[in-house]
Amino acid sequence: MDVSSQIDELDYAGGGLKQETNWWGAFVIGLAGTILVTGIAPVMVTSLGAAAIPVTFIITCTGWLLCLFLAELSAMMPERTGGSPSYAYPAYKERWPRGAEHVNGFTAWAYWLGWFPVAPLNMILASFYLVDRFHLSTAGFTPIHTPIAWWTLGISIFGILLLFIPAYLGIRFGTLFATALALLSMIPMTFLAIAWIFQPSKAHAGQVFHFHQIDGSGLFSSAFGHGWLTIYIAFAFLLTWNVIAMEAAACYIGECKDPARDAKIALNLEGGYGVFIYTMIPVAFVLVLGVKALGNPALVDPKTIFVRFAGKVFSTGGNVLNWLIAVMLIVALVLSALNAIMGCARSLHQMSVDGQFPRFFQHTNKHGVPDRAMLFNVAFSLALVFTGGAVEIYSLSNVGYTISFVPVLVGYFLLRKYRPNVNRPFRLPEWMKYVALALAALFFVIWIYGGLVYTSLPNSSLGGANTRVYYFIGWGILLSYLPLYWYRKRIEDPKYAEEAPPAAIPSPGS
């Protein structure tokens, strides 16, 4: 028999969650990543003009590639839960068992740092629109650096606590809730992305194809005091926190009834739709509003730019349009916040099952979901609300997010190279393992170099100050993984070993 043709069994621990959904559940909750277009598209086009379009397209395509790699990994490890970070550990543990534990712990904790802040960020943004629409008081206080209104604080806290309910009630209920939110937000969002097609007189192709920056200079001109390549890498740091987040669908493959089938459908669909929406929304803004108009700093606010865009396309305006856009954005933000509570909680749960995180996170409720891990996310989300603004949250959160994929992509390469005969219901071409390595290298450069440059840029939301302090706060949170790991290894594991009943001694002759 040809040994090379024998099926190899990959040893790994499953998350033990109920398998009660299908590809639609993973896809629709994973739309939380795609919905982040509402925040990043205005920032990109008002910062870089039409030059934002190719940069956004290229980085978003890396997100689709990531989805393809995760589709293969999730189908070959169908019991793992928590998405991307959960697939790193099995790739390393046989060759480097000691190091693999830290790869697993670091990757899951970095992913958590990348995703959980989406809940407070989105609820803060949603509260802004509610305060504006209902003309609520903007009186407030300044807890750290950015002022926050009392109404914003109250709405954000109430919203986060409210979202814990569908998250707690299980994956089936969460899917129904997410489906309703997705239909209410993504259908109008998709229509807005292509609305100019039905009003061709409102679109001006010349605004797009030269890819001019906001000041009228060319695509390869310097900006913000840096060369073109440096500044695009810097903005890629901001982009990766958003445009590759469509990988969130992978968090729920371990809860699908037929993961071998559902993984490739959910993640391919998520990636393809993500590339479409992340590309077409900036294209639509530039086509209709024009590069010169996008220099208006007021358009950084999503509600303002969407209202201005829709008003120009449909030659209308007024209170009704303001309400429609506000409702669409609020619903989109709520869906994304729901995944921020649910998704990375599963990563912490899986890390705890694997033995690198306190046992507290292993607990599941009667609905088969990691309730304590989700409650942990809620608690930290409530604390992060007090930072007051999106800029601060962006800067500290992406210290974890982008780097979390580097060990996973290297792990993909290792599994394809050293474990080629593991059953893979969905298998990419062999040469894709080198693409995975190249993607890991790109993400690392964006993370380490792009992050340093981006957080050094002056930010108008902070009165011209940079966000470097929040970048280093993110590093501090990232390194806090170590005491939690040591607590599990030095305190909990010895304690449980002492309490475990001794093994039965076989009787003589048995």
State what each model feature region is.
Residues G82, A110-F128, V243-C256, N319-P358, ...:
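Membrane-helix boundary/coupling elements in multi-pass transport proteins
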Residues P85-E94, A100, D132-S137, Q213-A223, ...:
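TM-loop-TM module centered on a large, flexible mid-protein loop between adjacent transmembrane helices
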Residues T21-T38, V43, S156-G159, S217-V288, ...:
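Hydrophobic, membrane-embedded alpha-helices of multi-pass small-molecule transporters
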Residues M1-I53, G63-A71, G99, Y481, ...:
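Membrane-interface "cap" regions at the ends of multi-pass membrane proteins
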Residues S86-G99, M123-T152, P188, C251-A260, ...:
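Helix-loop-helix connectors at the membrane interface of multi-pass transporters/channels
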Residues F128, L183-S217, A284-L289, V410-V422, ...:
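Hydrophobic alpha-helical segments and their helix-loop junctions in multi-pass secondary transporters
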Residues V37-T146, W151-T152, Y470-L479:
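Extracellular loop-to-transmembrane helix junctions
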Residues A51, F177, S185, L192-Q199, ...:
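A generic transmembrane alpha-helix motif of multi-pass inner-membrane proteins
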